[in-house]
C-alpha cells in the first residue's frame, strides 16, 4: 500500500502531513511512503531526513498523486489547484486530513464525484481511545499558546510585574473567552509569562479547569450550562446572550489582553466582543481572535489581518498553528499515524468500527456522513 503527501498549497500553510519520524514508522509497518521534494522544508524537516528512513522523494507531483492508495493532507486542496487529488488521484483513493467539511462544500462534493474515500480528522470523537488521534486538540493546544505569544509581541508593555531600582512595572491582565483546549493553553501560557489571568466559558465544568491553572473563573450569575454531550458548547438562548453581553461589557475594560477562542462546530462563531466593548478598553490593549475563519468572536476582526479600532489592536490571523510549524507538524503527523494504525486492518479500513465510520465523509461516490449530508441539503434548500 502506497501512502503519499504533497506540499500544502493553501497560502501560509507551512505544516506537513508526514514528518520523517512518522514516515519511518509507516515504512517499518510495511507501507511504501512517497513525499514531494522539500515537503517539510518550512517546518524544519530536510529531504535528507526522509531519505534516511527509507522515504521516496519525488519532484513530480502528478507521479506521486496518481499512484497513491492513501493521500495524507493538512488542509484540503482547492478545486482549482494544479495536481490536485480531485483531478489526478485514482478512483477509490483514500484522503485523510483536516478537510473542514462544514466549510469546504465544493471540495467534499468534488471528492464524492471523483469517488474518493475521505476521512476528516476534525471528526475524531472525543473519547478516551481516540485521544492520540485528536488533531483538533493537538493543533488547538499550540494555537492557544501562539495566540498569547502574538498578543505579547503586539502589546507595548511587559506581561509580568517587575520591581526594579527605576520603578515598578504592573502585571498586565489577560481575559480568555472560551476555555476549550486552546483557551486552557492560552491561560497557562499567559500565567507563565506573569500575567494576571481570568477565563470565561458558558460550560460550568470549565470553572474547575480554569481555577486549576491558577486563574480566576468569571461568569454572570445564574450561569446557563451550554455543554453538549460531545463536550463542545452549544448556542445560548437570546436571554443568556443579552446577559452575557452585559456582563462582558462590564468587565472587559479592566483587561489589557483578550484572547477569544469560542467556536461551535458547524456553525458561525458566537459574537462576544462588540465594538462598544472595544471602545471601552484601555488604549494599547490587544485582542487576539482565533475564530475568524468561522466568522470571529470580535466585531471588526478580519480574517488574516491585524487591525486597530479605538486604539486597540485586533489580531485575526488565520492558522496560528503554522507559525510553529515544526511542533504542530510533529503532533498532527502522529495523529494521522495513530488513526491509520487503528483503522487499517490487513490493508483495509475497518468500516465496521464506529470511530472510523464517524470520520468517514465520502465513499463510493456519495457523501455518507449524515451530519455533513444534512448540512449541505439545508444549504441547498435555503438557496
Curated annotation (Swiss-Prot):
**What EC number(s) is this enzyme filed under?**
7.1.1.1
Instruction: Return the Pfam families for the record.
Output: AlaDh_PNT_C, AlaDh_PNT_N
Tell me the CDD domains matching this sequence. Answer: Rubrum_tdh
**Key word Cell division present:** no
What residues does NAD(+) bind to? 131-134, 181, 201-203, 231
**Which GO biological process categories is it annotated with?**
NADPH regeneration
User: Which GO cellular component terms are attached?
Assistant: plasma membrane
Going by the UniProt record, its keywords in alphabetical order are:
NAD, NADP, Nucleotide-binding, Translocase
EC class, as a word, reads translocase
Task: Report the Gene3D superfamilies cross-referenced here.
Answer: NAD(P)-binding Rossmann-like Domain
Report the InterPro entries cross-referenced here.
AlaDH/PNT_CS1, AlaDH/PNT_N, AlaDH/PNT_NAD(H)-bd, NAD(P)-bd_dom_sf
Q: Which reaction does it catalyse?
A: NAD(+) + NADPH + H(+)(in) = NADH + NADP(+) + H(+)(out)
Q: What Gene Ontology molecular function terms does this protein carry?
A: NAD+ binding; NADP binding; oxidoreductase activity; proton-translocating NAD(P)+ transhydrogenase activity
| Similarity remark | Belongs to the AlaDH/PNT family.
The UniProt function text for this chain reads:
The transhydrogenation between NADH and NADP is coupled to respiration and ATP hydrolysis and functions as a proton pump across the membrane.
* Quaternary structure annotation from Swiss-Prot or TrEMBL: Heterotrimer of two alpha chains and a beta (PntB) chain; in Rickettsia, the alpha chain is made of two subunits (PntAA and PntAB) and forms a dimer.
* UniProt name for this protein: NAD(P) transhydrogenase subunit alpha part 1
